[in-house]
From Swiss-Prot:
<comment type="subunit">
    <text>Heterodimer of HisH and HisF.</text>
</comment>
<protein>
    <recommendedName>
        <fullName>Imidazole glycerol phosphate synthase subunit HisH</fullName>
        <ecNumber>4.3.2.10</ecNumber>
        <ecNumber>3.5.1.2</ecNumber>
    </recommendedName>
</protein>
<dbReference type="GO" id="GO:0004359">
    <property type="term" value="F:glutaminase activity"/>
</dbReference>
<feature type="active site">
    <location>
        <position position="167"/>
    </location>
</feature>
<dbReference type="GO" id="GO:0000107">
    <property type="term" value="F:imidazoleglycerol-phosphate synthase activity"/>
</dbReference>
<keyword id="KW-0456">Lyase</keyword>
<comment type="function">
    <text>IGPS catalyzes the conversion of PRFAR and glutamine to IGP, AICAR and glutamate. The HisH subunit catalyzes the hydrolysis of glutamine to glutamate and ammonia as part of the synthesis of IGP and AICAR. The resulting ammonia molecule is channeled to the active site of HisF.</text>
</comment>
<keyword id="KW-0963">Cytoplasm</keyword>
<dbReference type="GO" id="GO:0016829">
    <property type="term" value="F:lyase activity"/>
</dbReference>
<dbReference type="InterPro" id="IPR017926">
    <property type="entry name" value="GATASE"/>
</dbReference>
<keyword id="KW-0028">Amino-acid biosynthesis</keyword>
<comment type="pathway">
    <text>Amino-acid biosynthesis; L-histidine biosynthesis; L-histidine from 5-phospho-alpha-D-ribose 1-diphosphate: step 5/9.</text>
</comment>
<feature type="domain" description="Glutamine amidotransferase type-1">
    <location>
        <begin position="1"/>
        <end position="186"/>
    </location>
</feature>
<feature type="active site">
    <location>
        <position position="169"/>
    </location>
</feature>
<keyword id="KW-0378">Hydrolase</keyword>
<dbReference type="Pfam" id="PF00117">
    <property type="entry name" value="GATase"/>
</dbReference>
<dbReference type="InterPro" id="IPR029062">
    <property type="entry name" value="Class_I_gatase-like"/>
</dbReference>
Length: 186
């Protein structure tokens, strides 16, 4: 079962439809999940607040090897903190998310990614849909980057953690392929 984290915001319906997952904030269902998806929309602080009762089980599941896919805010919540506001994320990466100096990154853009199972069958140069104002700087966790006012991290994969800054559920066939690839992980 794929648990799609319900933190009181986010684009849950299209992710649920694409992955045939279960939208939940129930710690028991999350604990029983084979995979976890944290879809993204909303603010860092609101997400931190929205997961306060399930934060520990999410961290435990990820640490124990459960495949995790973070989408947009689901990538951002992996970090310690954000310029967006107060609160402590899941802290898998001890970095502070930054705010773009010039507006919001909204629209279609490419991802320069290393070969990875999650991008299997997706051509380099494909476009994905982005909408975000905050970003993860480049770091040792960066497996894919995108250019908007400079390069930022748009794809992370370390062990069982997969995270994308774009919205695959809004990115047409390449995005749906990425979601299928995640769903097919052993």
């Amino acid at each position: 079962m794929i648990a799609i984290i319900d933190y009181g915001s986010g684009n849950l319906a299209s992710v649920e439809k694409a992955l045939h997952g279960v939208v939940t904030s129930d710690p028991y269902k999350i604990d029983m999940a084979d995979k976890i998806v944290f879809p993204g929309a909303g603010s860092f602080s609101a997400a931190v607040s929205g997961i306060k009762n399930i934060r520990d089980i999410i961290i435990e599941k990820i640490r124990n090897g459960t495949p995790y896919l973070g989408i947009c805010l689901g990538l951002e919540i992996l970090f310690s903190e954000s310029e967006e506001g107060p609160g402590t994320g899941l802290s898998f990466f001890n970095e502070r998310l930054k705010r773009f100096k010039k507006g919001i990154h909204m629209g279609w853009n490419t991802v320069e990614f290393n070969d990875n199972i999650i991008f299997s069958g997706i051509k380099k140069g494909e476009y994905f849909y982005f909408v975000h104002r905050y970003y993860a700087p480049l770091g040792s966790y960066t497996c894919g980057k995108t250019f908007f006012n400079g390069y930022f991290t748009s794809f992370i994969n370390i062990n069982n953690i997969y995270a994308v800054q774009f919205h695959p559920e809004k990115s047409g066939e390449p995005g749906l392929k990425l979601l299928r690839n995640f769903g097919e992980l052993a």
